[in-house]
Amino acid sequence: MAETKSQQSRLLVTLTALFAAFCGLYLLIGGAWLVVLGGSWYYPIAGLVMLGVTVMLFRGKRAALWLYAALLLATMIWGVWEVGFDFWALTPRSDILVFFGIWLILPFVWRRLPVPSAGAVGALVVALLISGGMLTWAGFNDPQEVNGTLSADATPAAPISTVADGDWPAYGRNQEGQRFSPLKQINADNVKNLKEAWVFRTGDLKQPNDPGEITNEVTPIKVGDTLFLCTAHQRLFALDAATGKEKWHFDPQLNADPSFQHVTCRGVSYHEAKADNAPADVVADCPRRIILPVNDGRLFAVNADNGKLCETFANKGILNLQTNMPVTTPGMYEPTSPPIITDKTIVIAGAVTDNFSTREPSGVIRGFDVNTGKLLWAFDPGAKDPNAIPSDEHHFTLNSPNSWAPAAYDAKLDLVYLPMGVTTPDIWGGNRTPEQERYASSIVALNATTGKLAWSYQTVHHDLWDMDMPSQPTLADIEVNGKTVPVIYAPAKTGNIFVLDRRNGELVVPAPEKPVPQGAAKGDYVTKTQPFSDLSFRPKKDLTGADMWGATMFDQLVCRVIFHQLRYEGIFTPPSEQGTLVFPGNLGMFEWGGISVDPNRQVAIANPMALPFVSKLIPRGPGNPMEPPKDAKGSGTESGVQPQYGVPYGVTLNPFLSPFGLPCKQPAWGYISALDLKTNEVVWKKRIGTPQDSLPFPMPVKLPFTMGMPMLGGPISTAGNVLFIGATADNYLRAYNMSNGEKLWEARLPAGGQATPMTYEVNGKQYVVISAGGHGSFSTKMGDYIVAYALPDDAK
């Protein structure tokens, strides 16, 4: 019996020592590699100490606990020196060490070490308590947060356009893209009482022939007592706004295939034909119409009252947007965002497949007669004469920069503001023409009636990073030095928010040109400077090895090694064969969700994101031909291997992830924040989202901590001093106090909420609605839900 116990004791000590040995060898070898690359000396030193602990454990010496206590305390001090009291940044530096330290102080472990050492157990207990105290302090004192309070002062601003208070008739509520509602039945005091009012299921789910990038991004619109929305496959639904009951639906019969880079619909547009702006036959046929963009390059006009096609529009209600395109392969040109609608014109643009080849459709922007569908004008950004009207002999220009995000419109100026993308291929630009460069990654202002250029402002010169203008711009009239200035806020992937006078494109907030890293790939070039707006969420400092992260110190070490192997000299580091760290990454700090502006309080709500990517140029060679194989199609995704046929390099584009699939950059990856537009200062900024739905195993209960998750979708704000946002990689809709960022309410969604919510009033009751259908490439739960929330009748 005694011999058996002795064997068990030796086995326990041996296993403990073997774990310490594994840790020590891993840290020593990996750490030595990191030091060779120019990284931190901590890891090899920690590895040597762990090997010392291993030797003592094998020899049965309790002094191992003394040495381990010293390692633990030194690690915590080093961690705070590197990242401050940031709980999530300290976690991978300490988690394995803390858990192993707890193991060592268990009586059945240390008592099996026969060689005594005075105070060893107590020393390790003290080290663990100090470490725990430091982590606890960090958990309640987040250095990344900004904790100010917005002024509650509000001066009613003259509206740029008139919208009934209870309606939400356009993607951004108004075509100025403000995403602000004057409703206040739901307010900061009672929002905690919100309950689910109704749920509608569209029945539109992922199909076997869909690409991975199938997404549910719609923001419904509401006119009168009806809600109008499109699904991922662009099926159009009209719902009773009070009950969620279907009134009618229309199916355009989208024929997608896995090569489509997107299958999505962000929204639809509404137009009312009246006797003073439309022919009598149009008014009789289709007085109220929904304009529906479809991913295969068609545009539908549907009667808003009954769901039937408007016979007097284009070809019996269907407009072919592929007409005069130089390439007409389905899925290469995709209108994914709702068009701008004026009394005369439909202004529509679309996405062009990223990084496929030098022979792709044009990114032309067109104006069609809103009643008949006749082409009124064209603005082809890559043509010598952008306004040249095509003919049977003249097609639009290959690979013109496109505008895939929603546009904004000022009816008083009759100007439409288009956020422009870059000429594709995106990540190598040595072959681009001056015309292709001219309007790329810019804000372009066009006369909505004629298509003539009013002005343009370029936010990235010779863009090699896919730093499109990704968001609907927001228009507002803001007090600047005692004067009211009509401005446009243009959020960029870089984190900059460019603020321009929307009459002429002149900067209102300075955006000085600053030097950027040099040294492009062979045959390409980079500009010496780029504009940096003074109003910005871009990172305040470049990434370093200290910013690398992981679930443990083991994968954090791998991330640090990879970081030092990549080319990175800060924002705008050129693409390379070595592999370039792109931060902000290809998703951008801002995406299609945009920002919300309260024009009365003159404040903005934003949800910036911080997630690095890695791009790597692949020279042509075997398996990587210059020209596309016959019948080659797109990859159906924006990440992974992208061929870039026609230029000297293919490219791989991927998030910068650890071996466990976690971001290599430490959290937060997503924030909710408020800006004072009078001072252009960030007043408050909070992490948003938990990893509840990003874990490798189901987590049925709500996690009690906020990490700051990646997100897609935007915020809305209301006169009730409450903002709403879904968007995060966990399945929640949340409400925050606009003044200070306090979370007031959240509701679990049945699927991913990667969409921007909206709010409206019907029959005296205010509702908040969001699409919960998930996002394919974001890996959130897919579904087909439209969910509405309202206050119970006794809680208003």
Predicted regions and their residues:
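Mature N-terminal segment immediately following signal peptide/propeptide cleavage
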Residues: 155-205, 220, 673-675
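Hydrophobic or amphipathic alpha-helical targeting/insertion segments
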Residues: 99-115, 120-141, 239-246, 264-271, ...
